Regions:
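Outer-membrane beta-barrel translocator/channel fold
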Residues: 73-124, 149-151, 156-158
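Outer-membrane beta-barrel "beta-signal"
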Residues: 121, 160-173
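Outer-membrane beta-barrel translocator domains and adjoining extracellular loop/strand segments
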Residues: 1-6, 46, 55-60, 87-93, ...
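Acidic, serine/threonine- and glycine-rich low-complexity intrinsically disordered segments
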Residues: 1-54
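Residues that define the transmembrane beta-barrel architecture of outer-membrane proteins
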Residues: 23-29, 56-58, 111-115, 161-165
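Membrane-embedded beta-strand positions of outer-membrane beta-barrel proteins
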Residues: 44-46, 64, 76-78, 119, ...
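Transmembrane beta-strands of outer-membrane beta-barrel pores
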Residues: 25-27, 35-39, 48-52, 80-84, ...
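Outer-envelope beta-barrel architecture signal
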Residues: 27, 38-42, 58, 70-74, ...
Length: 173
């Protein structure tokens, strides 16, 4: 992966390879609650994660399996994710600043939020096998973590959203 080195007008003067620390220590806290109802199961979870790259993240995930009789169900799914930027994240480097020991322009270690919205339909067959189809929409929105965008960079979308549609078919036997 590469990092652009720009001048005061925002024009690229050089391109360097990114550098990341050789190791990463992560810690996390996870909590999950499942609650059985007559009509189905509610599943809610929360995860906090932190690491020595200074990335802190929060994830809230929820699913509600709603039974449609004995053999069918639908399951809505909502997930929200938020993370801070790694201490070495830089969308670009300024040629007038000292070069840092580590730098990465990879948006995946930058500040961002993301969400998933989806629905799953499942059917249990008479032989005990089960099939299901799931459709979800995912959107990831990178954020500016406080960087001044010089010159022409101010007119560009340096943090475009990433969007995906997921369609999955499962068969369990």
């Amino acid at each position: 992966k590469l990092v652009s080195v720009v001048d005061g007008a925002g024009m690229t003067q050089d391109v360097i390879y990114e550098g990341r620390p050789d190791s990463r220590t992560k810690h996390s806290f996870f909590w999950q609650t499942k609650y059985a109802l007559d009509s189905g199961v509610v599943d809610v979870s929360y995860r906090f994660a932190t690491d020595d790259w200074e990335i802190d993240s929060h994830t809230i995930d929820s699913r509600f399996r709603f039974n449609l009789g004995d053999n069918n169900y639908i399951q809505p799914h909502l997930r929200y994710y938020q993370q801070s930027a790694a201490e070495f994240y830089r969308p670009f480097l300024n040629q007038n600043d000292p070069m840092p020991m580590y730098a990465s322009a990879d948006y995946r270690v930058g500040e961002m939020t993301a969400y998933t919205v989806g629905l799953k339909y499942g059917h249990k067959m008479e032989n005990g096998h089960e099939w299901a189809v799931r459709a979800e929409y995912y959107q990831q929105d990178p954020k500016n973590a406080g960087f001044d965008e010089p010159g022409v960079l101010a007119d560009l979308d340096l943090y475009p959203s990433v969007k995906a549609v997921i369609l999955q078919f499962n068969y369990h036997f």
